[in-house]
């Protein structure tokens, strides 16, 4: 079974949200077969930054990336999360 790499942009609900704590919350609530490979921050506007997560997950996940977005969107401090890219890993 092949995995995919999902690029997920997470928007905090305010500029007071600590992105390191948000990352910790997200990584602890992801299903065990999901793995965060890399994290970055991206300036949005007026001192607000988005968290960019590169998440490795099984390709044959039921519902595709919807489950990932749902889990992250239900975390306190998240305004919303959206998939901005996806690529298949391996052959």
From Swiss-Prot:
InterPro entries per record: eEF-1beta-like_sf (IPR036219), EF1B_bsu/dsu_GNE (IPR014038), Transl_elong_EF1B/ribsomal_bS6 (IPR014717), Transl_elong_EF1B_B_arc (IPR004542)
Domain of life: Archaea
Any Pfam family hit: EF1_GNE
A GO term, aspect molecular function: translation elongation factor activity
Keyword list, A-Z: Elongation factor, Protein biosynthesis
Alphabetical list of CDD domains matching this protein: EF1B (cd00292)
Disulphide-bridged cysteine pairs: none
Assembly and interaction partners: Homodimer.
NCBIfam families for the chain: aEF-1_beta (TIGR00489), PRK00435.1 (NF001670)
Family: Belongs to the EF-1-beta/EF-1-delta family.
Functional note: Promotes the exchange of GDP for GTP in EF-1-alpha/GDP, thus allowing the regeneration of EF-1-alpha/GTP that could then be used to form the ternary complex EF-1-alpha/GTP/AAtRNA.
Protein name as catalogued: Elongation factor 1-beta
